[in-house]
Regions:
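Catalytic and ligand-binding motifs that coordinate phosphates/metal ions
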Residues: 274-284
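Beta-rich carbohydrate-recognition and catalytic domains
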Residues: 1-228, 234-274, 287, 294-340
C-alpha cells in the first residue's frame, strides 16, 4: 500500500477511535487493534522517564510495544521494543531491571521450540534500541517448561524482573505446571497450588535452579490456581509478591525474604469479583515510590472488540506501601506519600 494511502487510512481510523464513547481518555489504551493479551511488562524508571512495555499483536506475532512518560499522565509512543526473530517466534511476559554495570535489561518469555527465558539490553537514553541475547538464558524443553538432570519438570514461563542480592542475581519463573499437569490430570498433589521457581546467576548468562521460592498455603489460594506474571520487590520492612492466577486474576503476598526463600505472612486479592484485574507490573521511581499497573479486561465479546477496532486497557497507576499494621495501602501517585 502506498505511503500516502496508509496515512489517509490511519487518520480515518484515529477519527473513529476518538469518537468511541467507551474508549478511556485517561487510562492507557491500545492505540488500535484488538490486543489479546495486553499484559504490561518491562516497567522501568530511567533518566527521568517512566517506561512501560506491553504485549501487542502484529502481523509478525506477539511483540512488546513501548511508551514513556514524565508525569504518569501524558505518554509518548515509542517504536516497538521487541519483535519476534532470532531464537524466538513471539514475545511474552517478563520484567526489566538495571544490572550492576548500569545497563537496562529485559527478561521475557520467548515463544518457540528454541526459546525459553530470554534477555535483551539497551544502551540508548530513550530505551528505543534493544539487543537480544543470542540464546536463551534458560532453554525450554516444551512451552513454558524445562527439565532438570534428574527428570524433574520446572516451570520457565513469565520471568520476573531480575534482582541483585548478596552478590548474586536472582530471577523467578512462573508455575505453568498447574495448568499443564494439575488442570489436565486431576489429583496430582505435587502440582497443586501456586508456587514459583528460583534461579541464581553470577553473570546473567549462566543460571542454576535453586528450589521452589515459597510454600503455597491452601487457606489463601485454591489447588487449581497457578502463579504467573510474578513481580517481587521490597516494600517497607517486608517483601511483596504480586502475581496472577489465570482463573482468579491479580493477587499478592506480603512476607519475609531470607536465605533465598520467601515466607508469606498475609495474602490479598486485587480482583474481588472476577479476574478482570490482570497481569500486574511495577517499578520504583526516583522518589522511592513503588508504582504498579495491570491489564483491565473490558468485559466485552471478541466480536464487539473487533467491531470497535480496538481492545486493551491498563489500570491507572497506583502507588503501593505498607501501613503501620503491615497491611497493603494504595493510592493514585498524586495522593500517595512522597516516598514509600
Amino acid at each position: 500500500m502506498p505511503m500516502d494511502e496508509r496515512i489517509i487510512k490511519t487518520r480515518a481510523l484515529r477519527d473513529v477511535l476518538l469518537g468511541d464513547r467507551y474508549r478511556s481518555r485517561y487510562h492507557i489504551v491500545a492505540p488500535e487493534g484488538v490486543c489479546l493479551p495486553f499484559d504490561p511488562n518491562g516497567a522501568l524508571y530511567w533518566k527521568g522517564r517512566y517506561h512501560l512495555m506491553y504485549i501487542v499483536q502484529t502481523e509478525q506475532g506477539h511483540c512488546w510495544a513501548h511508551i514513556s512518560s514524565r508525569d504518569l499522565l501524558h505518554w509518548r509512543q515509542h517504536p516497538l521494543a521487541l519483535e519476534p526473530g532470532g531464537v524466538d517466534t513471539g514475545i511474552f511476559s517478563g520484567g526489566a531491571f538495571i544490572d550492576q554495570t548500569g545497563v537496562p535489561t529485559i527478561t521475557y518469555w520467548g515463544l518457540g521450540p528454541d526459546a525459553g527465558i530470554c534477555t535483551a539490553t539497551s544502551t540508548d537514553d530513550d530505551l528505543e534500541v534493544w539487543t537480544k541475547a543470542e540464546r536463551p538464558i534458560i532453554h525450554q524443553a516444551e512451552s513454558g517448561l524445562t527439565v532438570l538432570p534428574d527428570g524433574t519438570p520446572v516451570g520457565v514461563a513469565d520471568p520476573s524482573a531480575i534482582w541483585w542480592h548478596d552478590g548474586h542475581y536472582y530471577m523467578l519463573t512462573g508455575n505453568l505446571l498447574v495448568q499443564i499437569e494439575y488442570w489436565r490430570k486431576r489429583g496430582l498433589a505435587e502440582h497443586q497450588g501456586d508456587t514459583l521457581y528460583l534461579f541464581r546467576s553470577d553473570d546473567l548468562v549462566h543460571w542454576e535452579y535453586l528450589h521452589p521460592f515459597y510454600q503455597s498455603r491452601r487457606e489463601w489460594t485454591r489447588a487449581d490456581e497457578d502463579n504467573m506474571c510474578p513481580d517481587f520487590f521490597p516494600l517497607g520492612d517486608r517483601h511483596m509478591l504480586l502475581f496472577i492466577s489465570h482463573n482468579l486474576g491479580c493477587q499478592y503476598y506480603i512476607g519475609r525474604y531470607a536465605d533465598d526463600r520467601f515466607t508469606p505472612e498475609t495474602h490479598g486479592r486485587m480482583t474481588w469479583v472476577d479476574r478482570a484485574f490482570f497481569a500486574p507490573e511495577s517499578l520504583v521511581d526516583e522518589r522511592g515510590r513503588r508504582i504498579m499497573w495491570a491489564w483491565i479486561f473490558e468485559g466485552t465479546t471478541r466480536a464487539v472488540q473487533e467491531a470497535a477496532l480496538w481492545a486493551g486497557t491498563m489500570s491507572l497507576p497506583r502507588v503501593l506501601w505498607l501501613g503501620d499494621d503491615k497491611t497493603l495501602r494504595m493510592a493514585p501517585p498524586r495522593h500517595s506519600p512522597r516516598a514509600v
